[in-house]
């Protein structure tokens, strides 16, 4: 399968545009009121400093680095997100496969890039969203009880892989771009999760694991597994 690049050369993710604009207007407005409305400037200096720090953290959260996987993608599974590996185990998957699968989970802290990439090349076979709870994303039951979206992909070699985006205690919005029937490729964005979350990848049993527990991952760069 030929790899189709549909990248946009942006440095901030589109999901953050409205939030950053509204936040900038509010912070500037409040700082202006403090500067012009209060004779003592100490509150203004304190709030202005805090505003800059908070806004820079928001910009950092919505940053969108442009990454290209430079190697052959055949049978390769790349990390769909920045973060760290919190689960590597065989589990019974009941929502789509209804069989036993190898699950690799990546937890994203609030300081990680929150754009999500497709973990494999292939065709999108199924997309679904489930409403749910907002427990801490690293808890095992968050995978099946929290709000989540699943994207099932069939690779050119016939393997079926699922990527599940999971909302956490802070993350309250999952954005998924995948559509059933469309081709998808490593290097393309699969979606975005706002403010702390997790992504589970479900793979066929016998898949070679290329990461270890606690290992840091870089989305679209770290190879987490190789399909047989």
Curated annotation (Swiss-Prot):
Post-translational changes noted in the entry: Is synthesized initially as an inactive proenzyme. Formation of the active enzyme involves a self-maturation process in which the active site pyruvoyl group is generated from an internal serine residue via an autocatalytic post-translational modification. Two non-identical subunits are generated from the proenzyme in this reaction, and the pyruvate is formed at the N-terminus of the alpha chain, which is derived from the carboxyl end of the proenzyme.
Entry superkingdom: Bacteria
Subunit structure: Heterodimer of a large membrane-associated beta subunit and a small pyruvoyl-containing alpha subunit.
Gene: psd
PANTHER family to which the protein is assigned, alphabetical: ARCHAETIDYLSERINE DECARBOXYLASE PROENZYME-RELATED (PTHR35809:SF1)
Family, as annotated: Belongs to the phosphatidylserine decarboxylase family. PSD-A subfamily.
Subcellular location: Cell membrane
GO terms (BP aspect): phosphatidylethanolamine biosynthetic process
Enzyme class: lyase
Lipid biosynthesis in keyword set: yes
Major subcellular location class: membrane
A Pfam entry, by short name: PS_Dcarbxylase
GO MF assignments: phosphatidylserine decarboxylase activity
Keywords on record: Cell membrane, Decarboxylase, Lipid biosynthesis, Lipid metabolism, Lyase, Membrane, Phospholipid biosynthesis, Phospholipid metabolism, Pyruvate, Zymogen
Role according to the record: Catalyzes the formation of phosphatidylethanolamine (PtdEtn) from phosphatidylserine (PtdSer).
Species name: Phocaeicola vulgatus (strain ATCC 8482 / DSM 1447 / JCM 5826 / CCUG 4940 / NBRC 14291 / NCTC 11154) (Bacteroides vulgatus)
Topology in the lipid bilayer: Peripheral membrane protein
EC code: 4.1.1.65
Protein name as catalogued: Phosphatidylserine decarboxylase proenzyme
Active site positions, chain numbering: 197
A GO cellular component annotation in the UniProt record: plasma membrane
Manner of cofactor binding, per the entry note: Binds 1 pyruvoyl group covalently per subunit.
Protein's pathway: Phospholipid metabolism; phosphatidylethanolamine biosynthesis; phosphatidylethanolamine from CDP-diacylglycerol: step 2/2
